């Protein structure tokens, strides 16, 4: 058991005020990721808005939002069947009924102008990132993206098509990636691009709007 994160040993992890089942098929939720849910709550999006969590993993982001805003229609996608199995356990544990899981590569299933909000904590570490050695027990496909920013480009391109007018997108990103992700969002056509910091004061999330 040496080196195995305690959350995997106990099969439980805390996120916001909720507890989630986790195992090595999914990432362990991070405190900084809670900021995505908190910011989405701040958006005060309309009742019955359609939301997609891209690369849902354990489902902690989508399920937390589903419980805090039961009036929303929430979808959560992942390419990993293993991750979707874990997310299914968490949906059942929390008895969430305003959420649906979809096996999909990013937003490939989404129809044009069908979504009000896209949120994602995608893979954003480069394959040579020095932090990976400390994350050896976690699924590398959920951590690593070519060049570190390829996932942001692919999701942003697809999201711009899938979002309705005035729809929003929000990402968690690495602390040194703000300028790169800002440029990607701008190149994809997004406006009102705003960045935010985590509790340590590091650039950690960014959101934008389709206008």
Where are the predicted features?
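Conserved AdoMet
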Residues: 1-42
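Mobile active-site "lid"/loop adjacent to the S-adenosyl-L-methionine
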Residues: 122-151
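Short glycine/threonine-rich catalytic loop with a Thr-x-Gly-x-Asp
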Residues: 29, 57, 199-202
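Conserved beta-strand segments of alpha/beta enzyme cores
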Residues: 19, 73, 98-100, 191-194
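Active-site beta-alpha loop architecture of Rossmann-like, nucleotide-cofactor-dependent enzymes
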Residues: 7, 125, 176
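Conserved SAM/SAH cofactor-binding pocket of Class I
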Residues: 35-131
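Short amphipathic alpha-helical segments
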Residues: 88-89, 130-133, 156, 182-184
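Conserved Class I SAM-dependent methyltransferase catalytic core
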Residues: 147-209
